[in-house]
């Protein structure tokens, strides 16, 4: 008779006396077998048939377990006395096993019994009539006392409501671990423990499987060491990464990465034996880390320009700074015996953290990393409790877990540890032909963390999909298995719309092209082969310039760029070219060469040095009389470097005597033509008007910059009285122009600076010696370059004004030296713009670009070795070039952005740092030495040792610098593409390195001591390499954030904590999605029709707009949950002003709302290219739908109102300067255009209304309300932006009144008068008269120029102001038909 049945788990320690037993009528908890139980039937059916039918009672025969021998004898005596008919049988302790007996006679409570319950294990019980009590164990009573628990554990008497709960509980007694993690082979007793283990250790792998990529071989069979398990079967189809093995009691089972199924200790012994058999010497571990507190030695000037960052990654490029320090490895004394590691929820085999290699030599040498693999992880707290997980699964009504169907056959590489050369060749062929691949990149040094093997796949949804399934899957109608993306990121796919939006992105290919390897570079090609398998791209077309211009003209200078100055590149790429993780070997190696050599080394760089030190945007129109040499073919001779150095020399018409071939006024540039052709005369007149506008706008902004400079420096400066021979600015208190550093007045007050900004520290980046070496390296005269004090001032401006918004460079880690001085030049270039020295910025940009071209020339053959500071310098140069007023430079940004993105992927900067180098924390967990107090305390001290914390700090800064650089590229590339409609995005699905850390202060720390103090303050413990990895990667993967935007994952929403910088990146990803959907709508429409904006807009509204709305709602919830603010109020202004990310997010968010209504890329592209006539035409075409225009105007007015709130708050703080971020300025400019266009539509209705015509349309009530709202917001803006005592600028106002004297009335309307005019009961003629007289369309454009003038920093604002002025002239001179 089997021992398990209801009621058989009663305490067996029989200590009651006979008298006590006799007094118990029906129920004695300690022994149910000896007495007549009127409410139970016997367990044995034989006794049911022979029961005494008169009394309806029976004798129950049950086997009891005893620990004490005399108790067994006593129980046997009573059994024979009271129940002579029963043959009681007892088992000895050795036959029982580990049985818990710790209950007494009060362990049960009688409660009403349900009408019937069924025990599906052994026997069925039926309740006799009239009886209704069941026992509830005391242990279960503390949970619920009003619910029967009929399923009792035979070992510990714990009761359960459901049988499956009892089965799950019994695994703790039987030591059964039926659930296997497919990645590492770890076995667990419960399925939720496997899920928690995979979320912690294999988070990058969970969900990466795609049924369309993984196609198991039909004839292959599994080889999971059959002797270790009874049966293997596929678990529930929702669990792609869990295998259930019935009856398994092993801790670890074989996997493709650990075919032997051994623990870390066993693997170490196998490695030693293998090394001895092959006569290979294993490396000796480093000595024990010193526990004493020691000062970090002074860092040497690294070749990369940063402070000490160096890790043991031989053969892998380190993308930050280097030093002589190498990560030490703790050496445990051999005499110390390590206890067997505990079975943790998230521990894994050491083999999981090693990358495979086909070479036997590397297979052996790589085993030295086994001792660094984790033995136990201390942060195994689940993201979802087991109860929550099981409740979520039970709500889905999933089918029961069975072992009926075996899993699909999988081919495993059995030659992983085979030293046979033939086996190795077979393995290489198998890897080349197999279409299944991992999405984690193997590094060259074989230290990739958690590299998976081949694992099972199912066509059904995963458990995460089922738990997050809801009614709207980002507007697509829920989960669709046929188009399911591994990361639910198909909606961010940048493929062409051949199928639905849930196509796989390019990062997850359907087929992998095979690549052959050679014996000479087998090891590097093996690493590249795995990397190559990540992308389904064919080799990209090489970039070739299309007639790169040799001369560039703008309003401040005439420049003939030298090689690499502006990086003008017109790439001839295929339309379906995708940006994915690209294997450097698979790319045409000419793309970087053509980017480097896109201009002539012999070309010259010209600038007007009469105004070299002038404040503001100096106006100098292009001259037809300028002598500019023609472009020469590239010269690769030995003298080419001399030409490169001479390209910046003032000897090429850059004399210091003030002579120039540029006119100083527009009247000298253009004269009336002598011919009488009316067409030519009209064209010349338009050209003259355009030059006049450039001249007026330049004077306006230069005057504004000069006024701001006076406020900042507290001195009177006049551009017309600058000593051109000295070519230095006169600062108060400065006696020596070559002084090392001059302290400027603080540009930004403390209340405006972010609390996350870099702490003020006297760090001098430029010295006289460094400046002299830079001048000699570039062959520049000292007078044609900013002074040392000016360069350091520009660095200060960069720290205070630009870095808080775009903190992708860790400033405290920079070491000034000649190796990385282009980065210093690019930093000072941005600071020069904030110091209103645009000419200095142009010189610095040219020098930095020239040196970057030389650096790229060195790594031309191996772009994967590109260093981090090179890419960061290119990013800063891209900021300068994109927001430049030079159209030729802007046209070349497509090629420059494309090159940066390819360099990112070639250098694997978009991948986690742990895939390239090992974290510096030792893997031996502290619990390994719990039985040795001495070693236990020693290991604890090592974790907090100064040397170890310094290594952790360096690793953290390096990882975060890489992550933030990628996010900066994502930000600028997608926003620029969204503005101009170009396809040069760094796609969100390719960003896999992580997110900015939640605590921004950790990244801004200047040294490891400050960093350690903050860790203690935030209670962050780094006791394993995985805790450091998690912290360095921002504690979240960006793919999970994108999945939330797509699915609204409630699990992510409830558990994730992301920074505001991550929210900004997610908002940019939504902009990317809008661009993709807009392009898809155009492509879908253009298949059958010509370009038609109205048809494209209809396609957009029918297929894409709902998805964008859903994503924006999800983003809003996440942003508000993490402390964000969307609507500025008087109480929230201080919070918004203290967080630079919020100041960027609010306008960018409202800009996304506008883009969902109107496709503004057509208009902004024309403005960037200064095509004013086509700009006016495109704006009318885009705003054809009054409903969409009305909705976009709502968001535009909210943006202007938010800016006014910011400005008012700063003004109340007695601050006269409010520097708007460049992205916010761009969004504000677009908002002003939209508001003006809507007001122009209303004014056109007013002018065209005919009261005598009964068919004339009336003004809608919504339009009345919106017009009144616009009038109120613009009046508030005017009152705060233009003080009453200040006169309006005559240059702009007079120019408009020259066109139409009634075009602009700057007097503010009375609020009561405006409300009365918009009242529907008011006479329509009064309403029309007020609308026409107010002329809000022209007033809005004028105030827009004033907004741009408040922060005249980036040169692009000249183009923006010119566009607003051109639109104003167009609006007052052209009579338009009514569109309402």
Swiss-Prot record:
Region (Disordered): 208-231, 413-445, 544-584, 624-643, 652-688
GO biological process, any: DNA-templated transcription
Pfam families cross-referenced by the UniProt entry: Fungal_trans
PROSITE patterns in the cross-refs: ZINC_FINGER_C2H2_1, ZINC_FINGER_C2H2_2
InterPro entries: Transcription_factor_dom_fun, VerF-like, Znf_C2H2_sf, Znf_C2H2_type
Biased composition range(s): Low complexity: 424-445, 624-634
Top-level taxonomic group: Eukaryota
Identification of the protein by name: Respiration factor 2
Species, as recorded: Saccharomyces cerevisiae (strain ATCC 204508 / S288c) (Baker's yeast)
């Amino acid at each position: 008779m089997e021992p398990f049945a209801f009621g058989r788990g009663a305490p067996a320690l029989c200590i009651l006396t006979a008298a006590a037993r006799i007094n118990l009528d029906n129920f004695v908890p300690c022994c149910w077998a000896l007495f007549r139980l009127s409410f139970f039937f016997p367990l044995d059916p034989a006794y049911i048939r022979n029961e005494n039918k008169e009394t309806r009672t029976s004798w129950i025969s049950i086997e009891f377990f005893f620990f004490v021998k005399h108790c067994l004898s006593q129980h046997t005596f009573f059994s024979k006395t009271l129940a002579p008919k029963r043959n009681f049988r007892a088992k000895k302790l050795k036959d029982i096993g580990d049985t818990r007996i710790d209950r007494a006679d009060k362990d049960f409570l009688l409660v009403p019994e349900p009408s019937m319950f069924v025990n599906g294990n052994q026997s069925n019980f039926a309740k006799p009539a009239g009886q209704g009590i069941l026992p509830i164990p005391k242990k279960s009573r503390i949970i619920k006392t009003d619910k029967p628990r009929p399923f009792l554990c035979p070992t510990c008497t714990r009761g359960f409501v459901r049988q499956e709960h009892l089965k799950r509980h019994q695994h703790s007694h039987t030591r059964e671990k039926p659930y296997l993690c497919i990645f590492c082979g770890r076995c667990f007793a419960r399925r939720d423990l496997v899920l928690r283990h995979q979320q912690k250790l294999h988070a990058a792998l969970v969900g990466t499987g795609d049924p369309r990529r993984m196609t198991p071989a039909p004839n292959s069979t599994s080889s999971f060491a059959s002797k270790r398990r009874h049966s293997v079967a596929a678990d529930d189809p929702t669990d792609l990464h869990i295998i259930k093995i019935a009856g398994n009691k092993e801790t670890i089972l074989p996997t493709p990465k650990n075919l032997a199924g051994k623990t870390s200790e066993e693997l170490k012994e196998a490695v030693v034996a293998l090394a001895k058999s092959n006569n290979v010497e294993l490396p000796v571990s480093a000595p024990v880390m010193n526990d004493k507190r020691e000062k970090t030695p002074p860092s040497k000037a690294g070749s990369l320009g940063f402070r000490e960052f160096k890790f043991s990654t031989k053969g892998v490029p380190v993308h930050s700074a280097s030093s002589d320090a190498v990560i030490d490895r703790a050496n445990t004394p051999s005499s110390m015996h390590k206890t067997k590691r505990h079975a943790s929820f998230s521990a894994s085999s050491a083999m999981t953290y090693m990358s495979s290699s086909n070479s036997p030599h590397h297979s052996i040498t790589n085993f030295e990393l086994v001792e660094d693999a984790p033995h136990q992880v201390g942060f195994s707290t689940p993201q979802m409790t087991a109860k929550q997980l099981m409740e979520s699964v039970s709500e889905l009504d999933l089918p029961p877990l069975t072992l009926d169907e075996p899993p699909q056959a999988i081919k495993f590489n059995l030659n992983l540890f085979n030293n046979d050369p033939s086996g190795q060749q077979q393995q290489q062929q198998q890897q080349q032909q197999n279409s299944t691949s991992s999405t984690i990149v193997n590094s060259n040094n074989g230290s990739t963390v958690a590299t998976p093997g081949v694992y099972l796949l199912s066509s059904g949804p995963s458990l995460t999909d089922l738990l997050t399934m809801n009614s709207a899957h980002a507007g697509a109608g829920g989960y669709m298995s046929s188009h399911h993306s591994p990361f639910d990121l198909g909606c961010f796919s940048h493929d062409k719309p051949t199928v639905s939006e849930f196509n796989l992105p390019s990062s997850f290919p359907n087929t992998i092209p095979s690549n052959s390897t050679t014996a000479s570079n087998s090891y590097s090609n093996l690493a590249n082969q795995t990397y190559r398998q990540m992308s389904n791209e064919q080799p990209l077309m090489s970039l070739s310039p299309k007639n790169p211009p040799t001369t560039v003209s703008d309003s401040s200078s005439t420049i003939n760029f030298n090689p690499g100055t502006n990086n003008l590149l017109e790439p001839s790429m295929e339309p379906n070219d995708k940006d994915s993780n690209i294997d450097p070997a698979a790319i045409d190696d000419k793309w970087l060469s053509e980017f480097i050599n896109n201009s002539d080394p012999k070309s010259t760089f010209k600038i007007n040095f009469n105004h070299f030190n002038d404040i503001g945007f100096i106006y100098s129109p292009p001259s037809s009389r300028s002598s500019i040499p023609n472009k020469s073919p590239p010269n690769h001779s030995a003298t080419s470097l001399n030409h490169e150095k001479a390209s910046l020399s003032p000897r090429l018409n850059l004399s210091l005597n003030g002579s120039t071939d540029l006119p100083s006024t527009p009247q000298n540039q253009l004269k009336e033509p002598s011919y009488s052709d009316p067409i030519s005369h009209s064209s010349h007149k338009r050209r003259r008007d355009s030059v006049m506008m450039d001249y007026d706008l330049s004077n306006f902004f230069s005057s504004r910059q000069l006024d701001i400079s006076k406020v900042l420096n507290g001195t009177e400066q006049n551009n017309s009285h600058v000593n051109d021979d000295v070519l230095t600015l006169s600062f108060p208190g400065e006696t020596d122009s070559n002084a090392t550093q001059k302290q400027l007045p603080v540009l930004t007050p403390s209340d405006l600076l972010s609390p996350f900004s870099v702490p003020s520290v006297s760090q001098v980046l430029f010295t006289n010696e460094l400046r002299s070496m830079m001048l000699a390296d570039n062959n520049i005269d000292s007078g044609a370059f900013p002074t040392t004090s000016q360069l350091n001032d520009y660095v200060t401006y960069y720290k205070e004004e630009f870095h808080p918004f775009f903190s992708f460079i860790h400033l405290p880690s920079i070491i000034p030296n000649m190796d990385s001085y282009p980065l210093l030049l690019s930093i000072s270039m941005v600071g020069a713009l904030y110091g209103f020295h645009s000419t200095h910025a142009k010189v610095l940009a040219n020098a930095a670009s020239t040196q970057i071209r030389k650096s790229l020339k060195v790594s031309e053959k191996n772009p994967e070795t590109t260093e981090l500071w090179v890419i960061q310098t290119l990013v800063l140069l891209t900021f300068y070039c994109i927001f430049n007023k030079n159209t030729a430079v802007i046209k070349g940004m497509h090629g420059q952005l494309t090159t940066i993105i390819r360099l990112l992927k070639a250098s694997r900067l978009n991948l986690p740092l742990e895939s390239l180098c090992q974290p510096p924390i030792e893997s031996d967990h502290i619990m390994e030495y719990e039985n040795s107090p001495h070693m236990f305390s020693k290991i604890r001290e090592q974790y907090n040792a100064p040397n170890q914390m310094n290594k952790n700090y360096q690793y953290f800064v390096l990882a975060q610098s890489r992550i933030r650089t990628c996010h900066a590229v994502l930000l600028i590339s997608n926003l620029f593409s969204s503005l101009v409609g170009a396809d040069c995005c760094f796609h969100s699905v390719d960003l896999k390195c992580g997110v900015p850390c939640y605590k921004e202060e950790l990244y801004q720390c200047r040294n490891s001591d400050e960093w350690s103090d903050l860790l203690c303050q935030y209670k962050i413990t780094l006791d394993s390499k995985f805790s450091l990895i998690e912290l360095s990667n921002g504690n979240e993967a960006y793919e999970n954030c994108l999945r939330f935007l797509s699915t609204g994952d409630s699990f992510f929403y409830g558990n994730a904590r992301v920074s505001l910088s991550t929210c900004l990146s997610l908002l940019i990803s939504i902009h990317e999605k809008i661009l993709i959907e807009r392009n898809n709508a155009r492509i879908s429409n253009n298949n059958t029709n010509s370009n038609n904006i109205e048809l494209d807009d209809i396609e957009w509204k029918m297929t894409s707009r709902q998805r964008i709305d859903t994503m924006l709602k999800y983003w809003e919830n996440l942003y508000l949950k993490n402390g964000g603010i969307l609507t500025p109020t008087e109480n929230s202004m201080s919070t918004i002003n203290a967080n630079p990310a919020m100041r960027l997010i609010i306008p960018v968010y409202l800009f996304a709302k506008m883009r969902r209504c109107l496709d503004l890329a057509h208009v902004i592209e024309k403005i960037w290219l200064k095509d004013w006539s086509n700009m006016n035409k495109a704006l009318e075409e885009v705003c054809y739908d009054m409903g969409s225009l009305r909705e976009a105007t709502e968001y535009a007015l909210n943006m202007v109102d938010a800016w006014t709130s910011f400005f008012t708050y700063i003004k109340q703080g007695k601050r006269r300067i409010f520097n708007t971020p460049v992205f916010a300025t761009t969004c504000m400019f677009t908002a002003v255009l939209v508001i003006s266009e809507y007001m122009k539509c209303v004014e056109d209705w007013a002018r065209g209304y005919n009261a005598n015509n009964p068919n004339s349309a009336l003004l809608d009530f919504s339009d009345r309300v919106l017009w009144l709202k616009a009038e109120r917001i613009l009046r508030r803006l005017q009152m705060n932006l233009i003080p009453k005592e200040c006169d309006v600028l005559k240059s702009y106002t007079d120019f408009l009144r020259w066109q139409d004297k009634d075009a602009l009335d700057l007097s503010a309307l009375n609020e009561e008068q405006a409300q009365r005019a918009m009242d529907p009961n008011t006479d329509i003629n009064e309403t029309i008269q007020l609308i026409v007289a107010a002329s809000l369309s022209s007033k809005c454009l004028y105030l827009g120029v004033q907004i741009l003038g408040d922060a005249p920093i980036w040169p692009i604002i000249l183009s923006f102001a010119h566009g607003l002025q051109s639109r104003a002239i167009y609006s007052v001179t052209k009579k338009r038909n009514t569109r309402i």
